[in-house]
Amino acid sequence: MNQEDPKKFGLYIHVPFCSRRCDYCSFATWTDREHLIDQYLTACKTQAATWTPELPVITSIFIGGGTPNLVPAELLMDVVADLPIATDSEFTVECNPDLVSSDQLETYVHAGVNRISLGVQSMVPHVLASLGREHDPTNVQSAVKKIRSAGISNINFDLIYGAQGETNEDWQTSLEKALSLEPNHLSTYALTVEPGTPLATDIERHPDDDDQADKYIQANRLLTGAGYSNYEISNWAQPDKESRHNLLYWNQGEYLGLGVAAHSHIGQKRFWSVRTPERFISAISKNSSVEAGSEQLDVEGWALEGRQLALRTSSGVPEEFIPHEVRHLTQPADLDGNLKLTAEGRLLANEVAVRLR
């Protein structure tokens, strides 16, 4: 049974187009497929239409990528135009700060977008260069101003730590400059080496585990001190500004994914789509399935997964499921009898998760 409120249902749309592929990126994205944008978004709309009769009211939408604000805003918003969306839904579009424009935002707002997630990554130029990012950190402030002027007050910053050459002082600078712009939510991710990426073959740029651990603690100290709650390992939010869409994932809620490589979870079945735009467009045009694979957890596996996900959040896990040998990584049980990881314990969350009963 879903832990999340059954009345909540999410929608994810994947936009696999980028002007440049970041060195650490392993997502389904392409820099040489812009000629397919119109066909792709039309295919996404067709895919959405096939699901519409079965869909409950959608309470959260997240459009990610890739670079969603690289594609024409009108075409992107048309994908969701006929879907049953709640009037109080959380509707997020992921954006590259360099590409944010007032006209684009006006179209988003007209379609119901009320949250923007900016791919900031760092506020220090040489760190961005190390990550293979191309945007100018000074454009973040300009983007935030445009977003707020358009009437969107709910803003998230994505940040990455652990790049080659990033000192603790650089990370502090990124955090402080980010906080000065007063986002409602920050997601901070340790740089991860994924197979097949340029970063994977460049050993000198691989992150150091101890350095990343120090930077996580540094971020937690600064962000919690600034009034943000660490409600999930990598996420901090101002009061009542937690990402409702992300909470749906962590609480095993249901959602539909549209587009290439998009994952869905309906009932207790998870399934995902083909990975390339060409295969996706072709399958949709032939009225064929775009499903590339699926899985279905049994009752025991479902319950264990729920506890492993809850361990990542501020909800915690009932005390009886956490072995004594790892309880030194948790805070004292709360009034509900749940144990929550300490900041240091969150660094070892994966190790604790595999020991859950």
Where are these regions (language model features)?
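A short beta-strand-turn-helix
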Residues: 1-5
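C-terminal scaffold of the Radical SAM
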Residues: 6-10, 30-51, 57-321
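Local cysteine-cluster metal-coordination motifs and their immediate loop/turn environment
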Residues: 14-29
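Hydrophobic residues in beta-strands and at strand termini
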Residues: 15, 95, 341-342
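Beta-strand-connecting loop/turn residues
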Residues: 18, 184, 254, 337-339
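Short amphipathic alpha-helical interaction segments
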Residues: 321-331
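A short, conserved structural fragment
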Residues: 330-338
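Short, amphipathic alpha-helical interaction segments positioned at domain boundaries
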Residues: 344-357
